[in-house]
Amino acid sequence: KKINNRFVYWKGQLGQFDAWENAKLIMQDLSASPQEKKAATQFYRSIRERKKIIDFAENKIDAFKDLVLANPDKRILAFGGANEFTDMLSDSVIPLAQSYHSKRTKKQKKAALELFRDGTINVLCSTKALNQGFDVPDANMGIICGITSKSLSMIQRVGRLIRFQKGKTGEVIVLYVRDSQEEKWIKNAVKNLKNVTFEI
């Protein structure tokens, strides 16, 4: 119980992300007692399991599919929280989409980009592979299905849709689980965005 209180204290004083990081440190600490390591491992696993449930929420796939089918003229970049979920998003709207992430071969990724750029598909689904140094001038809608505690990735995703073209606007839709950690993250993330109008 004493050890569990230690994690509750960390969570309250440092924030959940820091408590999670401290749990990882204890698991690696050679001087930590077996009880401390066990509690840290349980805490770490529970956070990961909760995140997986949120990341793979089936309602996100249903909402994503509805959005894609309701916007046939849009050029859409979609972002999932994990490679497997990104593939599930892409598979839900085949043949309109292809996935692009680190588990794909260079040949597969190149083919997906070419299909998107030449208009064969109008949806490109990614995880983090498109976050930095990548631009898709024709994209005009973003659907974000995976939220993280870091706002930078969201800023990069939004910026990719609207930058470099004067007068161009991008529409970004964020699918998140209500009353979850995702809702807190999205609200914190949008505070850091400038020249972007958001409705939550």
What are the residue ranges of the model-derived segments?
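A general structural motif
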Residues: 73-75, 169
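A short beta-strand element within the Helicase C-terminal
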Residues: 123-125, 132-148, 153-156, 163, ...
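Conserved segment of the helicase C-terminal RecA-like domain
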Residues: 160-192
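Conserved helicase ATPase core of P-loop NTP-dependent helicases/translocases
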Residues: 75-80, 84-134, 153-155
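Cofactor-binding loop segments of dinucleotide-utilizing enzymes, especially the Rossmann-like FAD-
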Residues: 81, 102, 147, 175-177
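Interdomain helical connector at the RecA1-RecA2 junction of SF1/SF2 helicase-like NTPases
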Residues: 1-71
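Long, largely alpha-helical accessory region at the distal end of helicase-like NTP-driven motors
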Residues: 198-200
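Helical mechanochemical/support elements of P-loop NTPase systems and associated helical scaffolds
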Residues: 60, 85, 108, 150-154, ...
